[in-house]
């Protein structure tokens, strides 16, 4: 079993309130779940108005499939946030359990 965890740190420069920031993050989380069927949540920088963190977890029996899903999630996030937020950093952890 392969698990891949992604921690995506976002810059949301146009947000002037936590409500505006959370609207961007919540929309991203919901669309990731609906489109890619991955586990995801807002996990950090909760009180920062112009920044946020989203965690994504992928589990697969096949390393190639898991990596492909992680790559697809990154591309989806970039496209989804275009003009609304920027990706500051993506931390990736890959674990294999036998």
Which sequence ranges carry the predicted segments?
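C-terminal structural segments of small proteins and small subunits
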Residues: 60-98
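Residue-level signature of transmembrane alpha-helix interfaces in integral membrane proteins
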Residues: 27, 53-55, 71
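Hydrophobic residues positioned within well-ordered beta-strands of beta-sheet architectures
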Residues: 4-8, 54, 88-90
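N-terminal first-folded block
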Residues: 2-39, 76
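Short, charge-patterned binding micro-sites
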Residues: 4, 41-62
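Generic secondary-structure boundary/loop-capping signal
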Residues: 9, 15, 43-46, 94
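Residue-level signal for beta-strand positions within conserved beta-sheet cores that form or flank
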Residues: 36, 52, 83-86
């Amino acid at each position: 079993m392969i698990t891949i965890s992604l921690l995506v740190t976002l810059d949301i420069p146009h947000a002037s309130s936590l409500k505006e920031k959370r609207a961007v993050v919540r929309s991203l989380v919901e669309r990731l779940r609906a489109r890619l069927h991955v586990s995801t949540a807002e996990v950090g920088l909760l009180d920062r108005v112009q920044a946020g963190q989203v965690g994504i977890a992928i589990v697969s029996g096949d390393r190639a499939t898991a990596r492909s899903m992680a790559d697809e999630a990154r591309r989806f996030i970039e496209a989804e946030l275009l003009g609304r937020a920027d990706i500051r950093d993506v931390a990736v952890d890959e674990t294999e359990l036998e």
